[in-house]
């Protein structure tokens, strides 16, 4: 009897009219979909329901899921790719920079001063001026700015303006006075107070020395941080970025992210990564959080060194343009045993660990640290990451795959730094700079990001940089260190499936397959078939997150 009843119920269900619950919330048709899924790499249509993909296939197959309330997107033959995952962002900093004076594209010191003075006139007296994202390397004469350049433009307003890489700032006399930085102030561990021939501070502070001024700057309010993140979230949608790994953040940033999460204002998924130095707090906060597909703590980030642009990246040999220095260790890597102890403790606590390393010595040192910690803590799927992995010795390239270390890299830096890097480190070391091709050929996992706000958030710009390597000054039309170019599909994977794997999220996103999150991007041009030189002309036409259109051009 029970078998008969079950059979009848099955037949009734099979013959029942299609219910609204079976209809898709969104259907995309007539597209050229690169799914990133090896089981079905190409399709023309997909459907989403409840924020996830319920069908991928042909128009005929997927079109059956249309209902009266289904949002239908006409792909018009355009290229569709999985939502871009940015493996390295500084979202609040990016938001604040969109609100601040933009000094990134100034032409020379005089232009720098003009723009700064014009912005200062819009600011109340006494209010701090920060950010700026200046880059002296774009000037014809790349002389570093000093407080003498700032003082006439800023008046009595304290000003400390960060270089685009975030590893150096130039401060005016008012800010230095408030921080009590003088000729008697010693360089802090991991930092440099740049001085003139008389020993007086020029206003330039490198790495840990910047903290002397940041310590006296009023903290940003919760509402200010929230507004900066709202602006950053909109900017992400405009660029087709559907997920970010946001690092290294502080408690104020995470509090603001949680406010946006509760308000339902998130249109980008956030994998938040606090500082390695606060790994215990990260562990405890993660235990209290919901940690869903919108907001979670994924790991912690540390530092070994500084940056190439600030001459604080750590190398085995001195800089070619300054033989007195080979770079510096970051303060948390002095001594290196301190950093190693934190890596080991965070790893044992179940946190993914990623460490910033730019110079070849910094990369060699952290690879050795990762190897020792893995042996000490035992085998597991830990996915250690090196952020930037910028300058590598040839012998260290193969160690990434051997040790299972992910190279989390930002390709736009290659076409930016490539204008002047060779002057700083010479030709031989440049050959394994941003070594995308060599790392992939050695079997390493390559995850891409932007390092926004240091570089533009645009993944299209990043793909162009990885594929073409044409420097921003136009002097390398065939590519700077062209042997390190990679293909478009390889770059796409670094921004999608491998980026997802770099955050332990490959089961949720990074490719377009049934059951995964319905995050995808509609592009104006087919980056997989157009001449590579035309990639920069590509625009994001639409961004879809969780089956909802969050941006449309």
What are these regions (language model features)?
Residues 14, 21-29, 34, 38-284, ...:
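Divalent metal-binding segments
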Residues 343-354, 358-384, 388, 394-398, ...:
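His/Asp/Glu-enriched, well-ordered alpha-helical/loop segment
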Residues 294-312, 404-415:
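Non-cysteine beta-strand/loop elements that form the S-adenosyl-L-methionine
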Residues 2-13:
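Bacterial N-terminal signal peptides
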Residues 55-56, 131, 520-523, 552:
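A generic structural signal for residues embedded in beta-strands
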Residues 235, 552-553:
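Short, gly/Ser/Thr-rich active-site loops of penicillin-recognizing serine hydrolases
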């Amino acid at each position: 009897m029970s078998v008969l009843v079950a059979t009848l119920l099955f037949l009734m269900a099979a013959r029942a009219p299609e219910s609204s619950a079976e209809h898709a919330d969104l259907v995309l048709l007539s597209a050229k979909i690169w799914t990133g899924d090896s089981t079905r790499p190409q399709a023309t249509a997909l459907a989403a329901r409840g924020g996830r993909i319920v069908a991928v296939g042909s128009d005929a197959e997927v079109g059956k899921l249309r209902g009266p309330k289904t949002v239908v997107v006409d792909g018009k033959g355009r290229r569709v790719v999985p939502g871009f995952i940015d493996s390295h962002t500084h979202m609040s900093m990016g938001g604040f920079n969109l609100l601040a004076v933009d000094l990134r594209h100034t032409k020379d010191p005089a232009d720098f001063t003009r723009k700064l003075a014009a912005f200062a006139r819009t600011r109340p007296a006494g209010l701090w001026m920060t950010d700026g994202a200046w880059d002296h390397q774009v000037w014809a004469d790349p002389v570093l700015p000093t407080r003498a350049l700032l003082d006439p433009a800023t008046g009595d307003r304290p000003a400390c303006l960060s270089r685009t890489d975030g590893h150096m700032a130039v401060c005016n006399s008012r800010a230095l006075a408030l921080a009590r930085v003088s000729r008697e102030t010693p360089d802090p561990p991991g930092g440099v107070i740049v001085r003139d021939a008389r020993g007086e501070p020029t206003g330039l502070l490198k790495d840990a020395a910047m903290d002397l001024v940041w310590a006296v700057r009023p903290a940003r309010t919760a509402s200010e941080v929230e507004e900066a993140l709202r602006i950053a979230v909109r900017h992400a949608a405009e660029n087709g970025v559907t997920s970010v790994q946001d690092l290294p953040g502080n408690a104020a940033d995470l509090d603001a992210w949680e406010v946006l999460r509760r308000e339902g204002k998130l249109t980008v998924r956030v994998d938040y990564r606090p500082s390695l130095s606060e790994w215990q707090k990260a562990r405890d906060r993660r235990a209290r959080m919901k940690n869903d597909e919108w907001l979670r703590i994924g790991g912690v980030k540390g530092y070994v060194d500084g940056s190439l642009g600030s001459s604080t990246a750590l190398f085995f040999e001195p800089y070619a343009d300054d033989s007195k220095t080979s770079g510096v260790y970051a303060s948390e890597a002095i001594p290196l045993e301190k950093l190693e102890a934190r890596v080991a403790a965070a790893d044992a606590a179940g946190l993914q660990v990623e460490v910033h390393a730019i110079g070849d010595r910094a990369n060699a040192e952290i690879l050795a640290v990762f190897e020792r910690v893995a042996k000490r803590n035992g085998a597991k799927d830990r996915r250690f990451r090196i952020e930037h992995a910028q300058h590598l010795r040839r012998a260290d390239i193969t160690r990434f795959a051997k040790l299972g270390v992910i190279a989390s890299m930002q390709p736009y830096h290659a076409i930016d730094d490539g204008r002047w890097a060779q002057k700083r480190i010479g030709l031989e070391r440049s050959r394994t700079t941003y070594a995308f091709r060599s790392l992939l050929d050695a079997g390493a996992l390559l995850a891409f990001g932007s390092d926004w706000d240091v570089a533009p958030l645009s993944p299209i710009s990043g793909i162009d940089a990885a594929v073409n390597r044409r420097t921003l000054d136009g002097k390398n039309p065939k590519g700077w260190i062209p042997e390190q170019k990679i293909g478009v599909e390889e770059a796409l994977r670094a921004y999608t499936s491998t980026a997802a794997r770099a955050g332990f999220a490959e089961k949720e996103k990074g490719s377009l397959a049934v059951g995964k999150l319905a995050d995808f991007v509609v592009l104006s041009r087919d980056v997989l078939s157009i001449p590579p030189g035309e990639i920069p002309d590509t625009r994001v036409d639409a961004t879809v997150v969780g089956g909802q259109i969050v941006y449309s051009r």
